């Protein structure tokens, strides 16, 4: 969300000898300043730190969780690093941190009362509020009568944020 401001500040500070980084939120850094500034540049430019897939899922009866597990197994068989989160059990901050770290994100959710299962909807709004971008996204929707979660998830993470959306063929 504040990537432009952070990038501008780091550009101005590039000629200075920085001995300490004192963020408003988080640790005060006195060592490895170059490495810390590099991290801030990654985060400010929304550049993934690693190639890999975050799979975040919300499941009511276990079927969406099963689909997420199958996807994770197939990706791992291909040698792709994955991490999974049940958004009903995992604090959103863990998923947000992983989303900033990895290059690809999969969101799998059940349609619940003609909407997105609540914890997934909250996570997606949190990611949108962080202005996370420059990721490849895929969505898995699960529903019987009138599945809508896929469409609704795409709407929350819609442009102007810069994402590449994968579509099933």
Language model features: what each stretch is:
Residues 1-23, 28-31:
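Metallo-beta-lactamase
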Residues 69-83, 158-162:
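Short helix-loop-beta junction
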Residues 64-68, 72, 120, 150:
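Short, highly selective alpha-helical patches that border small-molecule cofactor pockets
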Residues 52-56, 138:
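Conserved beta-strand elements of the Class I
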Residues 22-49, 122:
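Short N-terminal or domain-adjacent regulatory/targeting segments
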Residues 91-162:
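Helix-loop-strand module that forms the ligand-binding subsite of alpha/beta enzymes
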Residues 38, 85-90:
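Short gly/ser/thr-rich secondary-structure transition/capping motifs
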Residues 164-169:
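Conserved small/polar residues in nucleotide/adenosyl-binding loops
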């Amino acid at each position: 969300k504040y990537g432009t401001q952070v990038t501008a500040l780091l550009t101005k500070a590039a000629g200075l000898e920085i001995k300490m980084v004192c963020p408003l939120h988080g640790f005060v850094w006195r060592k490895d300043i170059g490495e810390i500034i590099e991290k801030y540049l990654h985060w400010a430019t929304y550049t993934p730190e690693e190639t890999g897939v975050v799979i975040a899922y919300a499941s009511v009866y276990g079927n969406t969780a099963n689909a997420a597990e199958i996807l994770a197994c197939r990706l791992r068989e291909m040698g792709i690093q994955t991490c999974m989160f049940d958004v009903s059990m995992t604090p959103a901050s863990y998923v947000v941190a992983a989303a900033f770290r990895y290059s690809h994100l999969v969101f799998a959710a059940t349609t619940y009362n003609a909407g997105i299962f609540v914890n997934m909807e909250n996570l997606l709004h949190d990611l949108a509020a962080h202005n996370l971008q420059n990721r490849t996204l895929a969505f898995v929707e699960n529903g019987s009568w009138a599945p809508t979660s896929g469409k609704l998830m795409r709407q929350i993470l819609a442009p102007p944020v810069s994402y590449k959306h994968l579509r099933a063929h």
